[in-house]
């Protein structure tokens, strides 16, 4: 799906059109980077995209950019920090069900293994793994009941080839491959 969405947003001459009209897509951490590209591709395919980020400003800027780059896009805002259960609960209240869930939220950065304490490990685990687990657990039953839905976890090459200076990150990305 990610490869297809990137194609939708970068190769206008040979676009494969997927009609997602009437579908609601939540893309976590979608104010920039990969998340924004995914949101843009889904919006270009007709989905109503829920843009998520940690600050109202970044979400509003991403929505404005999305509306500018995808004529007819109808994005919605969902401001929430997904590094803990409270932020996930806040996001769930804002979305009221979706057809497509793209678990893109994640943090990364190089850290020395010996200096990475339990609190740092826990923060990476909660943000990179548990945010997606919590959202999937809450949103997937309605998809199953409707008979249609998609859940995607965005992982990384670091899941299979864990960098020595980002073991804490690589482990969380490996966990995502199992979900």
Positions of the model-derived regions?
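Residue(s) in the substrate-gating loop at a strand-loop-helix junction
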Residues: 156
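Conserved glycine-rich cofactor-binding loop
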Residues: 24, 31-32
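Catalytic Tyr-X3-Lys loop
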Residues: 99, 107, 114-133, 148, ...
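A short, exposed helix-loop element centered on a Lys and neighboring polar residues
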Residues: 136-137
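Flexible N-terminal pre-Rossmann segment of NAD(P)-dependent oxidoreductases
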Residues: 9-26
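Conserved glycine-rich Rossmann-like NAD(P)H-binding loop of the short-chain dehydrogenase/reductase
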Residues: 47-61
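The beta1-alpha1 cofactor-binding region of Rossmann-like NAD(H)/NADP(H)-dependent oxidoreductases
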Residues: 56-57, 78-90, 118
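Active-site loop immediately N-terminal to the catalytic Tyr-X3-Lys motif
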Residues: 40, 114, 163-167
């Amino acid at each position: 799906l990610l490869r297809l969405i990137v194609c939708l947003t970068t190769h206008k001459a040979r676009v494969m059109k997927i009609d997602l009209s009437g579908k609601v897509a939540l893309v976590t951490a979608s104010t920039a980077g990969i998340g924004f590209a995914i949101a843009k591709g889904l919006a270009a395919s007709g989905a109503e995209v829920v843009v998520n980020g940690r600050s109202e400003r970044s979400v509003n800027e991403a929505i404005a950019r999305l509306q500018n780059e995808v004529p007819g896009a109808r994005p919605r805002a969902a401001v929430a920090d997904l590094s803990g259960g409270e932020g996930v609960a806040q996001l769930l209240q804002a979305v009221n069900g979706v057809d497509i869930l793209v678990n893109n939220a994640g943090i990364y950065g190089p850290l020395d293994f010996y200096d990475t304490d339990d609190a740092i490990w826990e923060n990476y685990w909660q943000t990179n793994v548990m945010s997606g687990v919590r959202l999937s657990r809450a949103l997937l039953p309605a998809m199953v009941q409707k008979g249609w839905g998609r859940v995607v976890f965005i992982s990384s090459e670091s899941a299979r080839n864990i960098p020595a200076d980002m073991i804490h990150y690589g482990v969380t990305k490996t966990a995502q491959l199992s979900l």
